[in-house]
A protein has these predicted regions:
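Catalytic domains that recognize anionic headgroups
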Residues: 1-375
Length: 375
């Protein structure tokens, strides 16, 4: 919502709140005469935690809800043990009558998120009587752990795929509502994700621990009849999305790191992507250009360099091969490439002051642990 990197606005962990002085896109849209609404699906995006509701005429988050029996269960089983056992049995049961849904219905577990069906229902409700023009943010969480997938999609599919299918159907319902209310023709729809997911790639599952492309590369779709049906191969960034939308409607910009993608010509391919791992899981930072990636583990003082054109799956660390004297490696070329990327990465990092840590209460810590954001 800010067009900034986390190190810039200071919110580097979930559960932290955005400073009120930071400009947000919803405020810019509202100032430009747009009706604004947001519908989010996970507790740490509730305004009381994130402070992201600023600028929205209506922000539906449900707030954080903690069931009465859940704290008892969480004291019997530590989070890691419970998550291990729960992960093994949560989908046991016929159709929708699974262990997960049973425990959730009894109030014995709190998943801190709601289903795509609930999110779509709220978004459709916000579209009732909406004034044009409007800016809407609709956030789905089902593909993220603890993954909400109805039993009908679990037949013959793994849980991740089933959750994707569920979200796909709900996005379709939302688009159908735009059509039914004759809003689709004048609405630019943007679809994206905040991160990818490691599904066993490079020996990891989940996200936030590494900077491999399976975690960084996300879909970005701009859908409107006035736009050409084509795929843009140039590297772009999620921080460019809101600056692009504000620029398209002539609203004031955010003065942020992100830049509008469309300037009348082809999308530039030279936009560098800087990245950082989730702090709980390690101190990794990286720089990705259109053909190369440098990753630095600042805790372990290790680096990796990948030639993405020749090695798109990032299986070959050229720094290791160069040090080992592998025959097809030119050490001078590798060192030169590393030094250039390292200089750019250092330049980016030097522009930030030390992040001031925000304290969160015990309930928020418990919520973040349940969602997998604590080691």
């Amino acid at each position: 919502m800010t067009g900034q990197y986390p190190l810039d606005h200071g919110v580097v962990e979930n559960g932290w709140g955005l400073d009120e002085d930071e400009p947000v896109a919803a405020e810019r849209f509202r100032a430009a005469g747009f009706d604004t609404f947001g519908v989010v699906s996970v507790d740490h995006l509730a305004h009381e935690h994130s402070r992201l509701g600023r600028g929205f005429d209506r922000y539906v988050d449900g707030g954080s809800r903690y069931d009465a029996l859940y704290p008892i269960l969480s004291r019997i089983y530590d989070t890691k043990t419970f998550n291990t056992v729960f992960g093994a049995v949560k989908n046991v049961g016929p159709g929708r009558y699974t262990v997960k849904n049973l425990l959730r219905g009894l109030g014995l577990i709190q998943l801190h998120c709601r289903t795509a069906r609930s999110v779509t229902a709220d978004a459709v409700g916000r579209l009732e009587g909406v004034s044009e023009p409007f800016f809407g943010w609709v956030h789905y969480f089902d593909v993220h752990e603890p993954r909400n997938a109805p039993g009908e999609f679990l037949e013959g599919h793994d849980e991740y795929t089933a959750a994707m299918m569920h979200v796909d159907r709900q996005v379709g319902e939302l688009l159908a509502t735009l059509e039914d209310r004759q809003l689709r023709e004048d609405t630019l729809v943007v679809l994206t994700g905040d991160h990818g997911e490691a599904l066993g790639d490079h020996g990891y599952t989940g996200h936030g621990r590494t900077l491999y492309d399976e975690e960084l590369h996300v879909p970005l779709v701009f859908a409107h009849d006035a736009l050409p049906r084509e795929t843009v191969d140039a590297q772009v960034r999620t921080i460019d999305i809101l600056p692009t939308l504000l620029d398209l409607v002539g609203a004031d910009g955010l003065g942020a790191d992100g830049e509008p993608l469309f300037d009348g010509g082809p999308v530039r391919a030279d936009r560098p992507v800087y990245a950082m791992a989730y702090p709980t899981f390690g101190d990794r930072v990286g720089l990705r250009t259109d053909g190369w990636k440098l990753v630095r583990d600042r805790a372990g003082n290790d680096e990796a360099l990948f030639d993405l054109s020749a090695d798109p799956e990032e299986r070959r660390n050229l720094l290791e091969d160069s040090a080992a004297g592998v025959a097809d490696i030119d050490p001078d070329d590798v060192d030169g490439r590393r030094e250039a990327l390292s200089s750019d990465l250092e330049g980016w990092l030097s522009g930030f002051e030390a992040t001031e840590r925000q304290e969160v209460d015990a309930e928020t810590e418990e919520m973040l642990a349940d969602l997998g954001y604590r080691g």
